[in-house]
Amino acid sequence: MTDQNRLARQVAALADAHVLVVGDLMLDRFVLGSVDRISPEAPIPVFQIKNQRPMPGGASNVATNVVALGGTATLIGVTGDDEAGQVLTSLLGDQPRLVARTVVDATRPTSVKTRYVAQGQQVLRVDSEQRHAIGADVTAQLLQMIDAALPEVGALVLSDYGKGVLTPDVLRRIIDKAAARNISVVVDPYGRDFARYKQAGYI
């Protein structure tokens, strides 16, 4: 069997798959416009906004990709108690075959990456986020949601962007819970310390 045939069969199998995605939720904002002059105030381009488009990012994007390939996704993560979190939740609610279960943490903002694009090129990216580890109460709520979701799924994807949700303790406990149920674990890793993902099936 060729690699292309094997990939085609794996993609087709996603039509019957229910995947749990856990990780760092983000809102991607794309600000589309044009640059046709330099500011008289400083040697910087003047960006003229024409359109803006929000999209699910981070682990949220992984879950929407699972759905796009024909699967069913349950997404678990953390948002802030803010407008960006509400926008992201609304976007995810519009996705068929995707259930988003989020813990709202009032102590941190929803991670937002805003990209300014002109003439097909990124001009600037602005990040609004905090990267500290989630607290004990949020961790407990997160693990409770994961416990409830694991019996329903056939695979687990850990989407780690280093934003403080998948702490070493959370990773260890999630991977152990999945292993106890013989659930395949796939990791989209952050950094080079792959020991954090010990016992995961695929990194």
What does each of the following model-derived ranges do?
Residues 43, 47-50:
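Divalent-cation-assisted or electrostatically stabilized phosphate/pyrophosphate-binding catalytic cores
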Residues 1-36, 51-203:
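Ribokinase/PfkB-type carbohydrate-kinase core domain
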